[in-house]
């Protein structure tokens, strides 16, 4: 499973959204209905899945699906 596929699966599991909704340009808050707690849990799930730490400054820049995929891919 690719980084993109894993990130999308985490997003679907954490936010309870469908694969069709998880588009690269989808905003977690505006398009996928996430709140601040959802975003925190999403970051924690990605950290656990990929064995990396996402610092708070970087986490605040992860606003869209593509941001998360690009960030994690850059850490691999």
UniProtKB/Swiss-Prot annotation:
One of the GO BP terms on file: lipid A biosynthetic process
Domain Carrier residues, every copy: 1-76
Magnesium found in the keyword field: no
Cytoplasm keyword on record: yes
Post-translational modifications reported in the UniProt record: 4'-phosphopantetheine is transferred from CoA to a specific serine of apo-ACP by AcpS. This modification is essential for activity because fatty acids are bound in thioester linkage to the sulfhydryl of the prosthetic group.
GO CC annotation: cytosol; membrane
Disulfide bonds: none
Keyword tags: Cytoplasm, Fatty acid biosynthesis, Fatty acid metabolism, Lipid biosynthesis, Lipid metabolism, Phosphopantetheine, Phosphoprotein
SUPFAM superfamilies assigned to the protein according to its UniProt record, in alphabetical order: ACP-like
Superkingdom per UniProt: Bacteria
Gene Ontology molecular-function annotations: acyl binding; acyl carrier activity
Pathway the protein takes part in: Lipid metabolism; fatty acid biosynthesis
Pfam family, any one: PP-binding
Chief location of this protein within or outside the cell: cytoplasm
PANTHER family hit by this protein: ACYL CARRIER PROTEIN, CARRIER DOMAIN-CONTAINING PROTEIN
Biological role stated in the UniProt entry: Carrier of the growing fatty acid chain in fatty acid biosynthesis.
Assigned protein family: Belongs to the acyl carrier protein (ACP) family.
HAMAP family named in the record: Acyl_carrier
The protein's name: Acyl carrier protein
Organism expressing this protein natively: Oleidesulfovibrio alaskensis (strain ATCC BAA-1058 / DSM 17464 / G20) (Desulfovibrio alaskensis)
């Amino acid at each position: 499973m690719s980084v993109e596929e894993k990130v999308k699966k985490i997003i679907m599991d954490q936010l309870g959204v469908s694969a069709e909704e998880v588009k690269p340009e989808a905003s977690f808050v505006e398009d996928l209905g996430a709140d601040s707690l959802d975003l925190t849990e999403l970051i924690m799930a990605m950290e656990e899945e990929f064995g990396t730490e996402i610092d708070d400054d970087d986490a605040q820049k992860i606003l869209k699906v593509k941001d998360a995929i690009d960030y994690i891919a850059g850490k691999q």
